[in-house]
Amino acid sequence: MRSPYKKSKAAYICVWCLVLLLIVFIWLRNKSAFLPSVISTLIAILLGFFTSRLLENIISNTETTKRLGYLHMEMDPEKFISSYIDIPKKTTGDKEKMISYAYLSSGYEAAGDFDRALETLEKGNINGSDSLDTLYLSQKCRCLIEKGILDEAEDVLKELEKRIDSITGNQSLKDNQRQVQYVLSEMLRAKKGDSVDVEYLEGRLKATQYRIGRLEIYYTIAMHYRNKENKKKEMETLSIIREEGGNTWFRKWAEERLDEI
């Protein structure tokens, strides 16, 4: 995989420039020793290859993490989108490209642009791997629920459940995706006007690392209380969403709902 980030490419080029200088130095120093020069050159090339790839990957991961922080920590989807929108097109490799499109899709989803989130998600190619298939299906289901296309969301949720059941040899992934699937099923139930397992969802709040994920759960709980016509609890939950929602659609939705009550 070649990194889509300019800093990574610059580091890659710098490493190989140093390697070329080292090779020139080796041959100038050992003009009369052909075999040692060849061996030293091969070692320098191998060293350059592994060093450049390692440095490129480190910088690429750092840049991706920084940009995802705009979304998951700063709760600013527009800032994330503007910094990441060109990355998927520059990414090589089907797996990496699918992941990058899923990241961008989550940015559009957090901004409330569900059509673009779904459109962006479909640009990636799932390749039958457990992690990519479940990533694609869970993100698609989430967008469909939030957009209000509930029948299709239910079909995708069933497909996700079957795909999770088929996972073998990676119990950690299976358990994690099972939790994701259950939260989505509760969101779908709340969206349909049914009751949800609030106790379970409140437990998931404590275990959810990212703030976007917490908003998703609060959103489900708020809809549950709305369905139950428990205005006091609903307003308490909406107030939390308004306070923690940053620049996401969750906050705007909570503000509009609070104005209605």
Predicted regions and their residues:
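N-terminal topogenic membrane-targeting module
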Residues: 48-127
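Residue-level signature for tetratricopeptide repeat
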Residues: 69-73, 90, 107, 143, ...
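Solenoid-like repeat scaffolds
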Residues: 51-57, 85-96, 122-131, 158-174, ...
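TPR repeat positional signature
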Residues: 63-67, 84, 101, 137, ...
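N-terminal alpha-helical membrane-insertion module
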Residues: 1-77
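Helix-turn-helix repeat elements of alpha-solenoid scaffolds
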Residues: 36-42, 69-85, 106-121, 149-162, ...
